Amino acid sequence: MPFTLGQRWISDTESELGLGTVVAVNTRMITLLFPASGENRLYSRSDAPITRVMFNPGDTVTSHEGWQLKIDDVREEKGLLVYCGQRLDDETPAELREVFLDSKLTFNKPQDRLFAGQIDRMDRFALRYRARKHQNEQALQQWGGLRGMRASLIPHQLHIAYEVGQRHAPRVLLADEVGLGKTIEAGMIIHQQLLAGRASRVLIVVPETLQHQWLVEMLRRFNLLFSLFDDERYAEAKLDSSNPFETEQLVICSLGFVQRSAQRFAQLVNTDWDLLVVDEAHHLVWSEESPSPEYQAIEALARATPAVLLLTATPEQLGQQSHFARLRLLDPNRFHDYQEFVAEQQQYRPVADAVTLLLAGEKAQAAELNVLSDLLGEQDIEPLLKSINSDSDDNQKARQELITMLMDRHGTSRVLFRNTRQGVKGFPQRVLHQIRLPLPAQYQTAIKVSGIMNANKPLETRARDMLYPEQIYQQLEGDDATWWNFDPRVEWLLNYLTTNRDEKVLVICAQAATALQLEQVLRTREAIRAAVFHEGLSILERDRAAAYFASEEEGAQVLICSEIGSEGRNFQFASHLVMFDLPFNPDLLEQRIGRLDRIGQAKEIQVLVPYLENTAQALLVRWYHEGLDAFEHTCPTGRTIYDAHHAQLIERLTTVGEQQGLDEFIHTCRQQHDSLKQQLEQGRDRLLEMHSNGGEQAQLLAQAIAEQDNDVNLVTFALNLFDIVGINQEDRSDNLIILTPSDHMLVPDFPGLPQDGCTITFDRDQALSREDAQFISWEHPLIRNGLDLVLSGDTGSCAVSLLKNKALPVGTLLAELVYVVEAQAPKHLQLTRFLPPTPVRLLMDRKGTNLAAQVEFESFNRQLNAVNRHTSSKLVNAVQSDVHAMLQQAEALVETQARQLITEAQQQADLQLRRELERLEALKAVNPNIREDELTALENQREQVLSNLHEANWRLDAIRLVVVTHQ
């Protein structure tokens, strides 16, 4: 091609230089100036890796002065192009010589990039098309936010999360019994709300001791990186913003931190949170006359935040007044009068009794049939009532239908979810082993001396000290005191571990110092492999320790945890728990056993308690076991009895030698425990349990998600993505892959990939047993960021390939076109449920025939060969006019398909949202817990969704030219 001064060209190999201008030409060489980058390049005339930039009628170009021109015609004058058309700013006719084009011009349309020589690799085109297809398929899945969590698929948890996560601004109480996974349920709801765009700012308020547990759980299980706000972090953020809380989207803080400063609290309330989560909400004290400051603080936050999740103990444990106080935070208009609430609850008793009757499968008596008729009076249920007393096949179906109707009328079932272990099932037995050991003389002396020296300390402090004789001894003898040389618990532990070499054993003690000293003794005396877990370790260090313990090959036999260090970690792959000492209250005891006693635990849990006779430990073992039955069963009454007998218990712990009346004390506690437990059992609300555990629907949901695990398409796509992005992959045993950044990645920092790399697995069970392995799903940030990286930029948007096929004439030209049909709308409308960005593939020949239906993408792609960029540019220049004609023919074809997709999406959205609205309106007639704002929001959402779908459009997303060759 002849070169003329002033012509505009673009570099095939350095497109980032911008638009170049020919500034010098001689017989062998040409010089290009790239004004945007200030660079010069010298090229050989005969084989320069550059492409002439030529625009066509219909294109819009920008001048060096900034104004834009819509091109109507192009003419050539002395080797230079002149673009004629209309200016967009003042709509006047204008001409623009190519020398005056803006040098920073970028080519966004695939066809522009193709004609400008910015041609990508063939494998990137294939990756882009696959990314479009997978993104479309995943958007249509109805369980978004539930599949990617690093947790077992427990039906009742999935049911609650799905039920609540789908709502507009959910305001609910999660009150499952301990060990049933309230934190995971909350995490799934948060994850769903964030992915769906219903929430973007989340505040979690927890007791100070649980901050790190939540931080770890959200990161490890859901890949949600929360910021922990304490005094130090607050002071730092204050330098960047007048309201420090606006510097982060996802925040965790403690209730104490919230309350310590009026200014800070005001800033927190004035931040636009979308979702508020409050853990341990039962500690918020309320009475009609004097609500506590903590309660009032959360009340103010709940009033200012659209969505609220309260995590709390079960209503039966709390008592009705405390339960009402929680509900009042969620909906003060609905729950405004306590006496009215009590009366209303009494009315639900017959509903719950009716459900119990139907569940039992027994025939209903006349009085019971009358109760059912009264409860469901506005509907014709006569045929159903006849069926439940017949022996017909419809009996069970009729019972289920009546239960569903009753559930709709249940007062608080939309705002309260509560599962019990009894209702959920699947928990292991706990077996207690008490190991009584003699009290060493050294400890006897230390305890006596400590009692004299610390006589002025508060009684509770002295009682706590008495539980840890090794700490007392060390305080008296100094840091060099080697208590482990004479403490019989250490000798017993060594023998136990050497005898049970094949068992994974979790050892928990109160203090980090004790944990570290025990690890040293095990290592030096018996070469026992042990990992240590304490509050002084970072999250990453704890992950490594937990992974070392979890590993079957060369892993640690024992993990030694401090009380605080073990919070929020579960090790259900182990079944042996050694309590080297005992915690001070029953909640902490349950928390310790709860590390192993989870759903998914396959074996009986062996709870081993070595204790020293004639000490506070010995007394506490008896009280926990004989008084509360807290070792072998969960103890919902523990806190109530502990609070009632707190003073007497403390006194007995500090005066171990004088234990008159101990048997009576323990007997009294046991009687109260049995009585309270019986009351709780009688108060069980079977209807609420049914609603909360989801029944058969929950089982089907878990099954459906499990079937998507180990998705072969995900594995293939992910490995292909990592290859093309340039991420190093190293296969390890046990389905593990190590990913590390390389020096030649598409982007310098791939979002979600740490600088030092990470270990991944596609296997859920493997991820659960390996704390250091990330569980890769379609919802994982590595995959979502990878999809965004490919689809939001130009990666793979144009390519050229050769097809070796002797059945076709040489030079046959095909254009593979990928259009995207999409609607632009705010994320919270979730338009992707109905019309996610949808790829439409056409395969055009020169005659305008679409061959896509006959030629499947993957098989076609396997037959193609790559072409280098320079040759590709020459091919494109040779067939440019043909490609323009093919694109025009394709426009008419794609319009038909696109309009059909848009119409179907509109119909589906209208039907689904109308049904949802009608269901809620029908429920509102019989259940006052349907909030008016929910109905209004749903109606508004329907109108906005349909309006935005009406505006949906389509565009060319990628183009690949295919030329037939016989060589």
Swiss-Prot record:
* Alphabetized SUPFAM superfamilies for the sequence: P-loop containing nucleoside triphosphate hydrolases
- InterPro entries in the cross-refs: Helicase_ATP-bd, Helicase_C-like, Helicase_RapA, P-loop_NTPase, RapA_C, SNF2-like_sf, SNF2/RAD54-like_C, SNF2_N
Look at the named UniProt entry and state the broad enzyme category this protein falls under. Answer: hydrolase
Which is an annotated Pfam family here? Answer: Tudor_1_RapA
Q: What is its EC number?
A: 3.6.4.-
* Gene3D superfamilies, per the entry: 2.30.30.140, 2.30.30.930, 3.30.360.80, 6.10.140.1500, 6.10.140.2230, P-loop containing nucleotide triphosphate hydrolases, Tandem AAA-ATPase domain
Give the residue ranges of motif DEAH box: 279-282
Its keywords, alphabetically, are: Activator, ATP-binding, DNA-binding, Helicase, Hydrolase, Nucleotide-binding, Transcription, Transcription regulation
Which GO annotations describe the biological process of this protein?
A: regulation of DNA-templated transcription
Domain of life from the UniProt record: Bacteria
Q: MF terms per GO, please?
A: ATP binding; DNA binding; helicase activity; hydrolase activity, acting on acid anhydrides
Indicate the segments forming the Helicase ATP-binding domain, all copies.
Answer: 163-333
Q: How does it assemble?
A: Interacts with the RNAP. Has a higher affinity for the core RNAP than for the holoenzyme. Its ATPase activity is stimulated by binding to RNAP.
Membership in a protein family: Belongs to the SNF2/RAD54 helicase family. RapA subfamily.
Function of the molecule = Transcription regulator that activates transcription by stimulating RNA polymerase (RNAP) recycling in case of stress conditions such as supercoiled DNA or high salt concentrations. Probably acts by releasing the RNAP, when it is trapped or immobilized on tightly supercoiled DNA. Does not activate transcription on linear DNA. Probably not involved in DNA repair.
Stated name of the protein: RNA polymerase-associated protein RapA
Lineage, top ranks: Bacteria, Pseudomonadati, Pseudomonadota, Gammaproteobacteria, Enterobacterales
